[in-house]
Amino acid sequence: MQVSGTIVVILMAANVEAKIYERCDLAKKLEAAGLNGFKGYTIGDWLCMAHYESGFDTSFVNHNPDGSSEYGIFQLNSAWWCYNGVTPSENLCHMDCHELLNRHILDDIMCAKKVVSSESGMSAWDSWNQHCYGYDLSEWLRGCHMNAKPNKKIIS
């Protein structure tokens, strides 16, 4: 009985650092980090992708059939972008995957910028291809009261 209580306390402590962002709060963080217009993508692109990848949840982890895992708000893959101690990794962002699971998303943003700077751009995220590419993304900024302009054009 005491062991299960200890496990609950440990899990609660781990989640204290996690955060599920509100859409407009995340939009403002992304804009402040310079993502609006970065490599031709708007805050709408980033919000749409993050919504479909993680539901804006910084603690989200997805385990893939190939043995790799995806971490954090942008679901950065352990085979390429971070090191999780399990999956052989290129670790192109030079970071531990677990650093992507807290409320402090500047490191996530810096790594996501590397992903977008690669040849694939935002096409690296299947969710962006399926749900965001070619769509009117203005709804993602509706009501956020910020300077970022939504992208209404199709990126080619």
UniProtKB/Swiss-Prot annotation:
GO function terms (MF aspect): lysozyme activity
Matches recorded under Pfam families: Lys (PF00062)
Keywords on record: Disulfide bond, Glycosidase, Hydrolase, Secreted, Signal
Active site (catalytic residues): 53
Known EC number: 3.2.1.17
Record's keyword annotation contains Disulfide bond: yes
Species in which this protein is naturally found: Bos taurus (Bovine)
Cystine bridges: 24-144, 48-132, 82-97, 93-111
Protein name per its UniProtKB record: Sperm acrosome-associated protein 5
PANTHER family: LYSOZYME C, SPERM ACROSOME-ASSOCIATED PROTEIN 5
Similarity annotation: Belongs to the glycosyl hydrolase 22 family.
Encoding gene per record: SPACA5
GO cellular component assignments: acrosomal vesicle; extracellular region; sperm flagellum
Catalysed transformations (reactions): Hydrolysis of (1->4)-beta-linkages between N-acetylmuramic acid and N-acetyl-D-glucosamine residues in a peptidoglycan and between N-acetyl-D-glucosamine residues in chitodextrins
InterPro entries on file: Glyco_hydro_22 (IPR001916), Glyco_hydro_22_lys (IPR000974), Lysozyme-like_dom_sf (IPR023346)
Localization of this protein: Secreted
Signal peptide boundaries: 1-18
Single Gene Ontology BP annotation: fusion of sperm to egg plasma membrane involved in single fertilization
Residues of the C-type lysozyme domain: 19-147
Coiled-coil annotated residue ranges, if any: none
